[in-house]
A protein has these predicted regions:
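N-terminal Rossmann-fold NAD(P) dinucleotide-binding loop
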Residues: 13-14
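Rossmann-fold NAD(P)-binding glycine/threonine-rich loop
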Residues: 83-88, 101-139
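NAD(P)-binding Rossmann-fold cofactor-contacting core
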Residues: 22-50
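Rossmann-fold NAD(P) dinucleotide-binding segment
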Residues: 58-99
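Glycine-rich Rossmann-fold phosphate-binding loop(s) that bind the pyrophosphate
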Residues: 9
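Extreme N-terminal starter segment of soluble prokaryotic enzymes
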Residues: 1-4
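Conserved anion/nucleotide-ligand pocket segment
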Residues: 140-200, 205
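Substrate-binding/catalytic subdomain of NAD(P)-dependent oxidoreductase enzymes
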Residues: 176-262
Length: 262
């Protein structure tokens, strides 16, 4: 039996717990193993209800150090507390699951090295492209292939805003507000619209594809804040649609990583 500790119990954490409970009978039959959530760390304990069988604490470090936990699911976000939790958990021989692309892009090299020394697994599939298994594809299916380049739309917020500016003739600000209302953009969407989120993702993909350390510090970054309705109009008249993409390629000149509108 694998005992899971959820570090963070917001929308994603609650949905994950529900999913694990709903698949309680199918998971063991598919992989001959069982998973249960045994601990939750949540800053808002007084505002929520919890399963009585689950230990709840406000201190995430309790999970990282607990002998009752085998797997830490990091749902905190950011790189401050999340970093401390992940490093501490690995030192205590706990496997890690995280969709935190900032954490992986900025500290992945250190995390993976420490994980190898402690013989634990670090899963970060959802850090890039959500449910599309691109990490597994690059790591396993294409492990022996020589990848020359990767290009793609890797930030949903930018993609939605640009699509709304084009199809609905919305201004940038109106499209951004609509993205917030529909839950496609964070309350503070800075990392999305300035290109940082895409830079984190393309760094992760490049490090796997080319088997290098994270190239984040060398990524050329440009967001979509300066794109106007006039830009959209002219591109449409020429038969094009502006998109924000992440690009990485390798050549005799070296490895290039960039994220910008095209």
């Amino acid at each position: 039996m694998n005992r899971i500790g959820l570090c963070g119990y917001g929308t994603v954490g609650q949905s994950l717990l529900k999913l694990i409970k709903n698949t309680d009978n199918t998971i063991p039959s598919n992989i001959s193993d069982k998973f249960i959530v045994s601990m939750i760390a949540d800053r808002s304990i007084a505002k929520k209800k919890y399963d009585k069988s689950i230990t709840v604490t406000e201190n995430v470090m309790d999970l990282a150090k607990s002998e009752e936990i085998d797997i830490i699911v990091e749902l905190i976000g950011g790189t401050d507390v999340a970093y401390d939790v992940v490093i501490t958990a690995i030192k205590n021989q706990k496997h890690i699951i995280s969709a935190n692309k900032a954490l992986i892009a900025e500290f992945g090299d250190e995390i993976f090295e420490l994980a190898a020394k402690n013989n634990v697994f670090v899963g970060f599939e959802a850090s890039v492209a959500g449910a599309i298994p691109i990490i597994n594809t690059l790591t396993n299916n294409f492990a022996n292939e020589q990848i020359k380049s990767i290009i793609g739309i890797i930030n949903g917020t930018c993609n939605f805003i640009l699509e709304q500016m084009s199809s609905s003739n919305l201004s940038f600000n109106d499209a951004l507000q609509k993205a917030k209302q529909l839950g496609y953009a964070e309350a503070d969407p800075s990392f999305d619209i300035n290109g940082t989120d895409a830079a984190h993702k393309i760094s992760i993909l490049a490090s796997i594809a080319y088997k290098i350390k994270s190239p984040l510090k060398n990524v050329t970054i440009e967001g979509i804040e300066k794109i106007t309705s006039m830009d959209i109009k002219y591109s449409r008249e020429l038969g094009y649609m502006i998109k924000h993409v992440g690009i990485t390629n390798i050549s005799d000149q070296g490895i290039e990583c960039r994220t910008h509108p095209v």
